[in-house]
């Protein structure tokens, strides 16, 4: 990747790319289920995720996404208004190039704008790549259930 990605709110025109990446991130769900959830989000019918950000290359290629919510609690977070990274994905060809960090920074900006002072996430215990990505983005591991907290 030659330059920084543009990170912006997901749009209807991003549906196919978002669907493809969601199917990769969460293969236990069917692509039809993901497609239905995307349609519900874009129509404003769901509360979670509260926001979806997409990273795109200068040529418009989708590089990753972040799905965000605000929760009343997350592991080791006590503010009562915690931004939560519900889903975070970067396409394999764009990994280790700053795309994931760019998504997290944009998510932090979104969270601060909603009054959040903490940002949390989680991952499976066996997902060492995700753990490394969270740590590289500034999160601190706070529990062995692989929950993360990041002050904003």
Curated annotation (Swiss-Prot):
Keywords: Acyltransferase, Antibiotic resistance, Plasmid, Transferase. InterPro entries: Acyl_CoA_acyltransferase (IPR016181), Aminoglycoside_N6-AcTrfrase (IPR024170), Bact_Acetyltransf (IPR050832), GNAT_dom (IPR000182). It is an enzyme of class 2 (transferase). It catalyses: kanamycin B + acetyl-CoA = N(6')-acetylkanamycin B + CoA + H(+). The keyword Repeat does not apply. GO terms for biological process: response to antibiotic. One of its GO terms (molecular function) is aminoglycoside 6'-N-acetyltransferase activity. Gene3D superfamilies: 3.40.630.30. Homodimer. PANTHER family: AMINOALKYLPHOSPHONATE N-ACETYLTRANSFERASE-RELATED, AMINOALKYLPHOSPHONATE N-ACETYLTRANSFERASE-RELATED-RELATED. This is Aminoglycoside N(6')-acetyltransferase type 1.
